[in-house]
Amino acid sequence: LRLKPRARRVIVLGLDGLDPKIAKELMDREELPNFKALSEEGCFKPLRTTIPSLSPVAWSTFSTGSNPGKHAIFDFIVPDRKTYLPVLSSSHIGNTSRSIKIGKYNIPLGKPEIRLLRKSTPFWKILGKNFIFSQVLRVPITFPAEKFYGTCLAAMCAPDLKGTQGSFTYFTSAPDEEARHIGGVEVKLSPKGDHAWEGKIPGPENPLVEGAPEMEIPFTLQNGSGSWKLVLPDQEVPLREGKYSDWIELTFKAGMGIKAGGIGRFRLLRTDPHVELYLTPVNIDPRKPVMPVSEPKYFSSYLSKMQGPYATLGLAEDTWGLNERVLEEGAFLEQTWDIHEEREKMFMRALDTTRRGCVVCVFDVTDRIQHMFMCYRDPSHPANRDKDTEVYKDTITDL
């Protein structure tokens, strides 16, 4: 006997890292009128967070209703018990144990093991067992996406194509003594004539070759009468100084017809006195994912066909690039809002296509902007030394 549902559809909208004190402050100042209306129609209550109060821990508790002792997520990373080196706490990606050698290639026998390490059962799987359909979009700690009655696009801790949590690439033509040595991946541009430079885009390791060297894509950066373009093996990408390119398809060839597809966005940072080029972390291509970023597998491809390419990296907003000062604040905000717009399109489509059931969507913009711009609310903060704090002091409020 099934009881009559109290609601035809439930919508859960998550805003990562949004402090209830800041939200209340803005509501009282009439700067969040929709939030205020919701609080008056329903309720507005602060929730006690987890111990420890970290995003992967708190979101795992949100998903499962379990404490960290049950879902086994206590941090972003944990020590490997064999080596004591840090490893990701939420998922495990392992190589195949057997291979066969054909010429210079080692052909893996089987697929690599990819496991979600979070324990306990998320509420959408419980809903699915009761024949209630759910769309789960970008909820943290959902990689690899699990099978259930619904669709899921993974989020926080989903890797980039290299298997990292987000490695940008900085290309420069500056000589070593003048180059900015940064913490990301730095690649030297070599001159090719008077108005062109050559470089290589580093990609994932090649598991087919002894020693697993990085796969690379060669390119030429050309300047013709002030018009810049990036010439890749199978396409040309127009570039403008201080502007992002569209998402560009990047295909790394391992050999024997095996390829790994990713997407990235370029930004020509400056052209004088030296050429500097930025590439976002190479995201797993949602059109042909090499890892399980969605459930069903075709769901990421479906979304891409509906709205175009989009970021699949869990921590897609490049906070590392901003910390290393490869990106300026304005460039970071532009990237962040572009990713937010992609998420909005997904959410609105989920609302249109799910008339019954549950829709869950998490937006990260609140977390990323607060992390990177909280210091501007305090002019005396040590991170603001020699900075004009007036420009970005209202960035969080303007959210």
Where is each model-derived feature located?
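Active-site-proximal N-terminal segment of extracellular/periplasmic enzymes that hydrolyze or transfer
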Residues: 1-44, 53
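Beta-strand elements within well-structured catalytic alpha/beta cores of enzymes
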Residues: 7-23, 38, 62, 126-127, ...
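Short, charged/polar micro-motifs that form catalytic or ligand-binding hotspots
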Residues: 9, 13, 25, 52, ...
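Conserved structured core elements
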Residues: 17, 29, 56, 117, ...
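Solvent-exposed loop/turn segments at secondary-structure junctions
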Residues: 17-20, 52-54, 141-143, 367
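Glycine-rich loop at the start of a catalytic domain that most often binds anionic cofactors/ligands
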Residues: 27-29, 57-68
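Surface-exposed patches in mature extracellular/periplasmic domains of secreted proteins
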Residues: 47-50, 138-139
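His/Asp/Glu-rich, glycine-adjacent segments
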Residues: 66-386
